[in-house]
Amino acid sequence: MTAPASPTVRRRRLAAELRGIREDKGKSGDSVAAALRWSPSKISRYERARTGLRPQEVARLLDYYQITGPRRALLLGLAEDAAQKGWWEEFAESLSDDYKQFIGFEHEAASMAIWHVDVVTGVLQTEAYARHIISSYSRIEPLPPGMIGRMVGVRLRRQQVLDREDLRLSVVLDESVLKRRIGDKSVMYEQLQRLVRDGDRPNLTLQILPLTAQHTVFGESFVVFGFRDDSDELQQDVVITEQLRSSVTLEGERETYLHRIAFQALSDASLSPPESRALILDTAESYWSRAWQQASA
């Protein structure tokens, strides 16, 4: 199973290329807007990938920039892909723009390096664990009736990426995640058993950073998305860092490089995958299973 094109990723690549063409031509956004009788804000929005352009609008823009040949064909192909809708658009009213963008990156990434400091990362969560996490958000920001169920459904559907043979997923979880209670004890036991099963996937490397480890990477959870290297100049890595109610997207070469170095440092300080598996099993059995059984007795 491989991933089809993500409209989110294509739109961002197209936006970056069109912005680069305008700058190479020495034209301002206002001058392009005036020539095409578009509003300056339209130029700004599509160059920041806030909105998309219809394929015919891209063709008109390329005519103005006098772009022909293979480069034109590539950009028009990106425009066609960007105009498609991802499955997550079915839930558009329930999802923030940041979250839709995140799913779009996840949908097409060739690799993901995930560091989670507080909870199990979303693509590895059980339904019960996810429901408790999402329900907890409503204590900060009340959610409309039915929203929690839809959000859980989206999270579970995201997990289809685990079945992609072309995805390489590396996950480092802080050891505290294994002992931080989410829901009741049975939820935690089942979640840790799920981590053990997912850790056996051939395309997934799961490591635990022990509490005794000495490392220099502190701060929020983050994901580094890597995209296919197919000699396409429009490919670039993306980093997303998580905040309380939103996320921050970083695309600069320096930022993506620093986060890759940070992830490697975390991985180096972590237990090996077999050692991590043993720790997860031990925690599930000694910390949650026995306590669960005693509580149920």
Regions found by a protein language model. Give the residues of each.
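Short hydrophobic/aromatic-rich motifs at helix boundaries and adjacent loops
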Residues: 1-2, 11-14, 29-34, 44, ...
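Acidic-residue sensor for enzyme active/binding pockets
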Residues: 47, 57, 106-108, 175, ...
